[in-house]
């Protein structure tokens, strides 16, 4: 991640704000969804409507803890492979995070720009669709996502912690966590995953065959790489490789962003009733949908 100082500077500022923030005061609500006051403001959301996307922007959309930092790294490496230029991060890459002037500054950034986001499809600026930017949508099974989100809150020293996993799970299922409900996010994106400029990525598929996943991402973005280049990026993008470099790339929060990356870690925390509750929620929200099938829920969340 090229301009480490800017990336880390933003994270450090957010962590500093978090020190003084009680969990009960961590969120503000904008258009019905809770966001962390340490990273987002209503003024920034209002300014977001004026953001002008470009046709060669690369949008990475995901619910928190679904692998966006992983994909960010992979796309940065792909850009480097085809251009021989390290991708620079003059701003924190999550589109909705930062001050309201950032979109004005971003007009001067060279193409292609990587724009990460945790927003619902219908909360994104219209210019992304009008100008046909490429959108990678990353999903991870909801049980592992929940456990990863809990550990992020409770392991990072300066972020307000939950009293217990049970407390976090209750709030998660009510959508009272940063960026709201996983299932609301999923329902909102479900109808838009088969568009010409949209590519669905499953975290678990990447874990199973990283090189194949990188090749698919490269082809979707119109990057033509050799097998050797794909293999090189794959080696540099394993979870272990990224965790080893995480302090350099993401600062103090790095080791917590890349904690385990395992598939099935949910089995260490979910109780039987919680399992049933999430299985019912999945059935209610996503059974019979295109996204429901893509998530391979039975393989990764049952048994």
Swiss-Prot record:
Residue ranges the record marks as coiled coil:
none
Keywords attached to this Swiss-Prot or TrEMBL record, sorted alphabetically, are: Cytoplasm, Transferase
Binding residue positions for 3'-phosphoadenylyl sulfate: 65-70, 140, 148, 203, 237-242, 259-261
- Enzyme's top EC category: transferase
Q: What is its EC number?
A: 2.8.2.n2
GO cellular component assignments: cytoplasm; cytosol
Name a GO molecular-function annotation: sulfotransferase activity
Tell me the compartments it is located in. Cytoplasm, Cytosol
Q: Does the keyword Magnesium apply?
A: no
Q: Which GO terms describe its biological process?
A: sulfation
InterPro entries named among the record's database cross-references = P-loop_NTPase, Sulfotransferase_dom
- Name the catalysed reactions: thyroxine + 3'-phosphoadenylyl sulfate = thyroxine sulfate + adenosine 3',5'-bisphosphate + H(+)
Among Pfam families, the record links this protein to: Sulfotransfer_1
- Active-site residues, as the UniProt record annotates them: 118
The protein's role, per its UniProt record: Sulfotransferase that utilizes 3'-phospho-5'-adenylyl sulfate (PAPS) as sulfonate donor to catalyze the sulfate conjugation of thyroxine. Involved in the metabolism of thyroxine.
**Which family is it part of?**
Belongs to the sulfotransferase 1 family.
What protein does this entry describe?
A: Sulfotransferase 6B1
Report which gene this protein is encoded by. SULT6B1
């Amino acid at each position: 991640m090229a301009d480490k100082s800017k990336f880390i500077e933003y994270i450090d500022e957010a962590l500093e704000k978090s020190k003084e923030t009680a969990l009960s005061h961590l969120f503000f609500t904008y258009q019905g969804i809770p966001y962390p006051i340490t990273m987002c403001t209503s003024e920034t959301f209002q300014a977001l409507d004026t953001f002008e996307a470009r046709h060669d922007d690369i949008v990475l959309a995901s619910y928190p803890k679904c692998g966006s930092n992983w994909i960010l790294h992979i796309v940065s490496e792909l850009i480097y492979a085809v251009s021989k230029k390290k991708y620079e991060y003059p701003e924190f890459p999550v589109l909705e995070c930062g001050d309201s002037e950032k979109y004005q500054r971003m007009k001067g950034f060279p193409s292609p720009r990587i724009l990460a986001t945790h927003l619902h499809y219908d909360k994104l600026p219209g210019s992304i669709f009008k100008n046909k930017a490429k959108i990678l949508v990353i999903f991870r099974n909801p049980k592992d996502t929940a456990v990863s989100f809990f550990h992020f809150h409770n392991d990072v020293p300066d972020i307000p912690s939950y009293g217990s996993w049970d407390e976090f799970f209750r709030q998660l299922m009510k959508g009272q966590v940063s960026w709201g409900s996983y299932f609301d996010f999923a329902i909102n994106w479900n109808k838009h995953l088969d568009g010409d400029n949209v590519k669905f990525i499953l975290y678990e598929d990447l874990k199973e065959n990283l090189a194949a996943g990188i090749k698919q991402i490269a082809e979707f973005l119109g990057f033509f790489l050799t097998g050797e280049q794909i293999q090189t990026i794959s080696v540099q993008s394993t979870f272990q490789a990224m965790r080893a470099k995480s302090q350099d790339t993401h600062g103090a929060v790095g080791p917590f962003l890349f904690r385990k990356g395992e598939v099935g870690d949910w089995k260490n925390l979910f109780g039987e009733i919680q399992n049933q509750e999430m299985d019912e929620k999945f059935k209610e929200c996503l059974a019979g949908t295109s996204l429901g099938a893509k998530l391979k829920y039975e393989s990764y969340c049952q048994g």
